[in-house]
Amino acid sequence: LAVRHGDGNMSTQMEVVSVSTDKENQATLTTVRLKDKVYPFYIDVRYKAYEDVDMIETWTEISHTEKKPVYLTQFASAYLPIRRGNVWLSHLSGSWANEGQLTQEPLQPGMTIIKNKDGARNSHTSHAEVMFSLDGAPQENKGRVIGAALCYSGNYKLRIDTDDSDYHQFYAGINEENSSYTLPKGTVFQTPAVALTYSNEGLSGASRNFHKWGRTYKLAHGNTVRDILLNSWEGVYFDINQKGMDQMMGDIASMGGELFVMDDGWFGDKYPRKNDSSSLGDWVVDKNKLPEGIEGLIRDAKKHGIKFGIWIEPEMANTTSELYEKHPEWILKAPQRDPVLGRGGTQVVLDLANPEVQDFVFKVVDDLMTNYPEIAYIKWDANMAIMNHGSNYLPADKQSHMYIEFHKGFEKICQRIRAKYPDLTIQACASGGGRANYGILPYFDEFWVSDNTDALQRVYMQWGTSYFFPAIAMASHISAAPNHQTFRTIPLKYRIDVAMSGRLGMEIQPKNMTDEEKDLCRKAIADYKKIRPVVQLGDIYRLISPYDRLGVASLMYTSPEKDKAVFYWWKTEHFVNQHLPRVTMAGLNPDKKYRITELNRIDNQPLAFEGKVYSGAYLMANGLEIPYNHIVDYHKQNDYSSRVLYLEEVK
């Protein structure tokens, strides 16, 4: 904390004046009230300890009754000292189409800073979540681990100060750069919460704590399994039309899918949305593309027995749009400067600090749901960072509030939407995984892990993302080959096996698939419906990391009762006479017996252990001998191999 009091004094001397405890649903809320020794300046440090999950949230509330405003220049949410040698840090980094990359490193004397300055999204390049392994190099299923997650969707800063006596001081909160805040008398500045957990069962144990807490408290409908969907984007891109959407709906319905989502390209009147250079802000149906309108699409979805969803990007506009022509003052822009433009050379970000803009963004959703109440799903995108530091709404002396007020406005919009449409499913897409954070997930059901749907790269991205977020929140889609981002040709079996480890969906034009491919997807979707509760609501155990470069990656989910499990195995490299490690399982009941069934089998003959029964103790001590290659006809052989095994208790 750093402040400047109204008289210019830049010091604080806080002392505890009271400690109180209250019950709050399934949690105990402890408040430590601090007061400056001289000034009427107060800090309430809050600790919310959950009774049914191993998680504590902590945040601060800053207030004062000084005669003049107080100037806040640093305002961390939490401070955690760790007095321990040989501590390792696990954290995520990356970029667009390469999100969730895992980095693990020992903490050395000095300062480690993980921060974000995007403004609108905050999890492309780094994440506001970390894990500390207290017993040396990180291990997945043993060892003591502290996990921390800042529950915020805006600019953040995590800082770890390490001295030469093995003392680590961890700070987490809003990134104060360009965000100093003037606090008037009698108002309260509340920092976002930091969630803290502890596990003596390794990194996977800390992940299980985050997942259970997330599903129960920090994710919309977190304990309700998700629909299997087809999204139109990689199938047709902007080429939206009534007949094409009907065809895609019919195809996904025939494969057992439950939901169709029409992506970008459906809107615009004066400026029809033909590409990414126009129309954002003009949320009216393009009647040339969709002469029967959205009501016609919903009618087609009903005909095929599936639900209907739609894509929007309501926080954004294009300079080529009717909205911008009418309200140029609604965009974020520095005074006396031309705006820096984003995607398509025309994209700009709306000023969510402005209540009128908040009303407009809410109305985008409200109008859709009022006019078409049978819309079941909204894909909410955000394809631009805040590149223009300036708000026409905020006064000149409050411009440093812009980033903070933007996210306050965003949360207000989300709260209004959830209050009126509590049952609506909403995905947080932000140029892929830009909004994977626990600040906004209470208002969203899931997030799009990445715009990169390449199955091999998704193994790495989804592995890292699983450190903090449950499978039910991770949208994972089967896409085309060659892949549209990497141009890599990956067999359908492998693509399915990767997608089935998250919230399964499809991102493909089904009419370009062969009957054999559709049949494999049809069987996979049927099998996924059987294992869906285990994957989406179960406990994760990561077994072999792709980042260890052992040629294979493996993880599994177990049901809470440990009567069912799903085991995943993906080969990540291919060499002749390759040695791959034998994978031992985890999370099973050693005293129970499990029958093994392979899902998505393409081999000409069953695996040696197909249908056989093994004890949990055996599987966790010895594992199974997984063949390195598929036994298929010569012309179908390739360098990819993957397995999904379903384990079910035999009583």
Task: Label the model's feature ranges.
Residues V130-F132, E140, P546-P590:
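Carbohydrate-binding surface patches
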Residues T60, G186, A301, V361, ...:
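Conserved, mostly hydrophobic/aromatic
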Residues H221-K363, Y372, A376-Y377:
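Aromatic-lined carbohydrate-binding/catalytic grooves of carbohydrate-active enzymes
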Residues K493-I544:
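Catalytic cores of secreted or luminal carbohydrate-active enzymes
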Residues Y181-N200, Y640-E648:
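Short Pro-Gly-centered flexible turn/kink motifs
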Residues P291-G293, E325-H327, I331-K493, R503, ...:
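Active-site neighborhood of glycoside hydrolase catalytic domains
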Residues E573-K651:
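C-terminal beta-sandwich/jelly-roll accessory domains of carbohydrate-active enzymes
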Residues L1-D161, E177, K593-F609:
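Polysaccharide-binding surfaces and accessory modules of carbohydrate-active proteins
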